[in-house]
From Swiss-Prot:
Stored NCBIfam families: tigrfam_recA
Pfam family, one: RecA_C
Entry's localization field: Cytoplasm
GO molecular function: ATP binding; ATP hydrolysis activity; ATP-dependent DNA damage sensor activity; damaged DNA binding; single-stranded DNA binding
Annotated protein name in UniProt: Protein RecA
Chain's role: Can catalyze the hydrolysis of ATP in the presence of single-stranded DNA, the ATP-dependent uptake of single-stranded DNA by duplex DNA, and the ATP-dependent hybridization of homologous single-stranded DNAs. It interacts with LexA causing its activation and leading to its autocatalytic cleavage.
Length: 348
């Protein structure tokens, strides 16, 4: 075994050669690198921001949002777009399903005039456009809706009934190999919305699976399972859904946490409702019977009245949000799309 000084000298020579050939900083000691905050894009629900552990969706990463039809997947993605735009960011939406509703997006707070939208004809075209936009370095967030709608060119040009086994999976695998490094370097968040399918002949365990092969499961830093758990009614009219999101994979914090929040029809995620739920859970808001109080001041009788009070008093809502984040140790940077909690990212 070589003496320690000889090994150190050999390592220094190798590092110098690598720096010369590939550029300074190609290899570095982890301790030399300053601890960088995990920059995030808030989701619009404080319950989900807390469940993610860092105050929102991490920037520079691949995110997969999947679930049954009409569960709220696109709503979650559009709220992230709205929050990124509010912080001065540029957003793009690759609408492979050709189903984006501009009016609904506007109701959620999306600046539709500034939103870049593409409605590609083939899966190759969709992913090539996404790759070029990300490589520009100008994007903050990009949504691909959905993976299931990324149909390979060969399938579109072929006949009905033709077999195209594995084409979409290979397409996704190649695209993610190309995009992942660029996303990290540019700090762009890529949200892939995905659908569920049933595996035939499964006797034990869940028969559910997502489309597009295994590549997205591997490359995604965060995977969110979105489910509608109950309908919200005003008398006999259904006015929204109670939604549960499970963080099934998380590379920036502890996984397997759950969040529940309300999605109101035509309005999106109820930020105030989420604040009330988490505030009561953390004893920041007090619930006595049907009354909700905060620091001795009554918010209202019943959740709807309390929600209305917070909507009309955004400064009180912001104060409650700040206290919740501080109590749970989630950084103040969760309030914008450029900062994050002062915690080093943890890779599992």
């Amino acid at each position: 075994m070589a003496a320690v000084p000889d090994r150190e000298r050999a390592l220094d020579l190798a590092l110098a050669q690598i720096d010369k050939q590939f550029g300074k900083g190609s290899v570095m000691r982890l301790g030399e690198r300053p601890v960088v905050q995990t920059a995030v894009v808030p989701t619009g629900s404080i319950a989900l921001d807390v469940a993610l552990g860092v105050g929102g969706l991490p920037r520079g990463r691949v995110i997969e949002v999947y679930g049954p039809e009409s569960s709220g997947k696109t709503t979650v993605a559009l709220h992230a777009v709205a929050n990124a735009q509010r912080a001065g960011g540029i957003a793009a939406f690759v609408d492979a399903e050709h189903a984006l509703d501009p009016e609904y997006a506007r109701a959620l707070g999306v600046d539709t005039d500034a939103l870049l939208v593409s409605q590609p004809d083939t899966g190759e075209q969709a992913l090539e456009i996404a790759d070029m936009l990300v490589r520009s370095g100008a994007l903050d967030i990009i949504i691909i809706d959905s993976v299931a709608a990324l149909v390979p060119r060969a399938e579109i040009e072929g006949e009905m009934g033709d077999s195209h086994v594995g084409l979409q999976a290979r397409l996704m695998s190649q695209a993610l190999r190309k995009m992942t490094g660029v996303l990290s370097n540019t700090g762009t968040t890529a949200i892939f919305i995905n659908q569920l399918r049933e595996k035939i002949g499964v006797m034990f365990g869940s028969p559910e699976t997502t489309t597009g092969g295994r590549a997205l499961k591997f490359y995604a830093s965060v995977r969110l399972d979105v489910r509608r758990i109950e309908s919200l009614k005003d008398g006999t009219d259904v006015v929204g859904n109670r939604t549960r999101v499970k963080v099934v994979k998380n590379k920036v914090a502890a996984p397997f946490k759950q969040a529940e929040f309300d999605i109101m029809y035509g309005k999106g995620i109820s930020r105030e409702g989420s604040l009330i739920d988490v505030g009561v859970e953390q004893a920041i808001i007090r619930k006595s019977g049907a009354w909700y109080t905060y620091e001795g001041d009554q918010l209202g009788q019943g959740k709807e009245k309390a929600r209305e009070f917070l909507r009309e008093n955004p400064d009180v809502a912001a104060e409650i949000e700040k206290k919740i984040l501080e109590k749970l140790g989630v950084g103040a940077g969760a309030g914008d799309a450029t900062g994050g909690p002062e915690l080093p990212p943890v890779d599992f």
